[in-house]
């Protein structure tokens, strides 16, 4: 279920029964391979786990790396000249990018998901900041600098933001 929360009210957006882009955060937090479970259900109709086996194990945050101009937010297309994803403890990258691949306008701008996990939110943010500093994507523009700005902003660090926060950040 997707919703927005503003001024004490919840606003329903949609309910999706398909796998969501954010599933990686759920996988990290609960240490469950959701895709594997979906395939298993499709194959034999049964989950390999039950509800009382599902326990929160950590904190996780996902950054979506988009091929876009960080100022105008218009799509960026071209050839990826250099691609070097970050790594290290608590870092996961889901991407099909590679040096030499072509990014066209015939797709969603999401080119990678950078997921951190850690014992708490602060550790996740620290790991994401380091990973974004290490991330190298040359040949197309990305929103990496915007994500670094967000992760360093005091409002974000204090978890004091709402649905119009990003607009205020850039005004």
Describe the predicted segments one by one:
Residues 1-171:
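ATP-dependent carboxylate activation and anion-phosphoryl transfer catalytic cores
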